Amino acid sequence: MAARSGRSYITQLDIKHAFIKVGIGAEKRSKVISEKEKKITAYHEAGHAILFHVLPDMDPVYTISIIPTGMGAAGYTMPLPENDDMFNTKGKMLQDITTLLGGRVAEEIIFGDITTGASNDIKRATSTARAMVMQYGMSDKLGLITYGDDGDEVFIGRDLA
């Protein structure tokens, strides 16, 4: 950004934009979004942000946007990790799932309906839940056991659709 702006130095804003571009994807400002979709996206992202704020193990929110990205997201809520943790706890992973689903819940509470906007959130929440059970032995019902490596189990953990 600095070079494009003709500057020989970088600013904090340049670093922020680069961080977001690498982590989320470039903003796609050319995409025309209706006011209704902007409102849905804003409430969806607010649902995530509220949970980042109130759940004890979640990182603080770094930035929120309702501008679509080149990677297909209608918006995003990006936390800023406070630590570089090597391990995740079961409680933290459950809070991650809760936060991922917060956007979908906000849509339902505010609009009385849901959209397809949470599809990636649901995919990520499912991946976390599956790993908790199949890799980390975090299921209260199934106990301390790992179910196959990389989906090589025939009857457990395969996608049915």
List PLM regions with ranges:
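Short secondary-structure boundary segments
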Residues: 2-17, 76-86, 90
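C-terminal helical "lid" subdomain and adjoining coupling/linker elements of P-loop NTPases
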Residues: 2-15, 21-40, 136-144
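Soluble catalytic regions of large protease machineries
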Residues: 39-43, 49-161
